Swiss-Prot record:
Gene Ontology CC entries for this record: cytosol
Family the entry assigns: Belongs to the shikimate kinase family.
HAMAP family according to UniProt: Shikimate_kinase
InterPro entries in alphabetical order: P-loop_NTPase (IPR027417), Shikimate/glucono_kinase (IPR031322), Shikimate_kinase/TSH1 (IPR000623)
Protein name: Shikimate kinase
Catalysed reaction equations from the record: shikimate + ATP = 3-phosphoshikimate + ADP + H(+)
Primary subcellular site in the record, as a coarse category: cytoplasm
Pathway entry: Metabolic intermediate biosynthesis; chorismate biosynthesis; chorismate from D-erythrose 4-phosphate and phosphoenolpyruvate: step 5/7
Residues where Mg(2+) binds: T21
Note accompanying the cofactor annotation: Binds 1 Mg(2+) ion per subunit.
Gene name of the encoded protein: aroK
EC number of this enzyme: 2.7.1.71
Places the protein is found: Cytoplasm
Length: 181
């Protein structure tokens, strides 16, 4: 598989709580790739949590830092990259993402809410109606997420290993399509 990918990065996109980091680690191991989580890179570089960055710089400031990190990441190869849920909001980020294969982990609001209900580290969910906020964010972002090279629909029963296997099985067909064009 990694010879078929020829070092091309995999970028995992999708909502917070979709499983990008967990599945990304598994894909990296399977491919012999390195793994990066853009939120972790941002937090380590800033020596602050994502919550603190949001509080100090606002969402716009955070999104700029996120774009700067993505610009640097795309210059590397053989990486599986878990991105922040809102990385698709900035047009410039798509030019970076298109350096690799973009995989959308498509997860329903109900599953996301079940996974995130107790998570207090998500600044965009500090809302009176977190489930409604998730629904609103997903509605806003779905047209953007749908631009991915590969859409993986995730159900509640699937394990991260099953999701990673599903991705590995369909990568060859996506690569054939992109090389044929």
């Amino acid at each position: 598989m990694s010879s078929l990918l020829q070092g091309v990065n995999l970028y995992l996109i999708g909502m917070m709580g979709a499983g990008k980091t967990t599945v990304g680690h598994l894909l990296a191991q399977e491919l012999g790739y390195g793994f990066l989580d853009t939120d972790n890179v941002i937090a380590q570089a800033a020596k602050k949590s994502i919550n603190e960055i949001f509080a100090e710089a606002g969402e716009a400031g955070f999104r700029q830092i996120e774009s700067d990190v993505l610009a640097q990441v795309c210059s590397y190869t053989k990486l599986t990259v878990a991105t922040g849920g809102g990385i698709v909001l900035r047009r410039e980020n798509w030019s970076y993402l298109h350096h690799g294969l973009i995989v959308w982990l498509d997860v329903s609001v109900d599953i996301l809410y079940a996974r995130l209900a107790a998570d207090t580290t998500r600044p965009l969910l500090q809302d009176d109606d977190p489930k409604g906020k998730l629904r609103s964010l997903l509605e806003q972002r779905t047209p953007l997420y749908s631009q991915a090279d590969l859409r993986i629909c995730v159900n509640a029963e699937e394990t991260p290993e099953q999701i990673a296997n599903k991705i590995m099985q369909v990568i060859p067909s996506v690569l054939k399509q992109t090389t044929a064009n």
